[in-house]
Each structure stands twice: as C-alpha cells, then as structure tokens.
Amino acid sequence: MPLPLRLALVGDYRPEAVAHQAIPLALSRAAAHLAIDIEPEWIPTPELGDLTAIRQSHAVWLVPGSPYKNDEGVFSMLRWVREGEKPFLGSCGGFQYAVIDYARHVLGWHDANHAETSDEGRMVIAPLSCSLVEQRGEVTFEPGSRIATAYDSLSSDEGYHCNFGVNPDFSAALEGNNLRITAWDLNGDVRGIELTDHPFYVATLFQSERAALQDKDSPLVIAWMQAALDQR
C-alpha cells in the first residue's frame, strides 16, 4: 500500500481564520477525489529555521495569514521550494510572498517589499484600490495555463480575504524569465502566477480552498496534490 502523501502547510494557524477552517476540508476532498491517503502537517513559521519537515514533505502550501510571524523564514523556505522544484501552492498571503521572493531572488530587485510590513523600497505588493476582505469576484485564466487546466475552464468565481495585491506599476516587469501571470480580475489586475520551469508552482491571491466550505472541490488543491503524486 502506498505511503501517505506528506503535505506541509506553512503558516501560523488561527482557528478563527476562514481559510484555515477550509483547508482541512479541501485537503480531505482532494484526497478522496484522488483516492489517496494524506498526512498534512501544519508548520508554524517560527519553526522555519529548520527546513527538515519541508524537505521531507511531498508538497508545500504557503497558506493565508500574513504578515507571518517569521517573514525571513518564509522567504528562505520559498527560495528552497522554488529552486528545489517541490510542488508548491500559495494562496492569499502565500501569493504575495511568492511574488516578493521572485522579485528579490530571480529579478534581482533586492529592495522589493510588501507595503503591509515596510515603507521602504519597491512596493511590489501594495494596498488594493478596493478591499477584498470577505469579497468574491470573477477571475479569468490564461488558456493553457496550469490554473486553467486545473479548473478545465477559463474563469471562476472566487473568494478573497485581503487588502494587498500586486502593484500594477510592477506587474508587466514581473513577467519574463519563467514567471507567467495567468489569472486576472475583470479589471485586469493580477490574481495568479505560475512558474513555467517548475513541476508545479502556482500562487493565487484568491483562496480556492474556500470552495470546500460549499461542499465543492478545489481544483487547484487537487492539481497540487496530483503534481506531488507524479513526482513522488
């Protein structure tokens, strides 16, 4: 019998967070869909000084809940996952931090920053023009992208809980190398990215895991777990 799929859930768990309530349900539904056993482990960010649990996992999810208690640990983890080709999913804060990691360590924007935690440097992640706390909206996907393939659709209605996103002043410059912007809202603002040279590296500002609260599967969670199965 195959061993369970080991899943690292990186973030500072808060039982009142809607996304954190949804994640175990989304994982269970994805495991049932794929007919596999899973072994999820929440890893608080203060424990990221040691990446052993990350290395031993089959896939990593940087979950919502930023700013994290240990930002530097999160960025070290992101760089290792990106360079080590570990299947990765990021949602909400996980998306924001993945963008900053890429800007700093691939594009060389060493002063790339998040407006929620700094007032210096290039504010790659900046306040949204309208808050998306407990809001929903239509998201469109690039044809042929991993996100579109996972959804088997070019659009979806998705839920959010955030006040920050990609600064439009930097969105065009972020693309190139191996980062593709593959999801947008109806105004053309960035809502999802993926890396083309990675087995599975997808991050979205929306929280696809919330589908589980409506007794629906999250296509991205299923695709992330399938990528881990394919690589195992």
Language-model features: where?
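N-terminal beta1-alpha1 cap of cysteine-dependent amidohydrolase-like domains
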Residues: M1-F95, I100-S155, N163-N177, I181-D197, ...
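An anion-binding catalytic pocket shared by soluble metabolic enzymes
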Residues: Y160
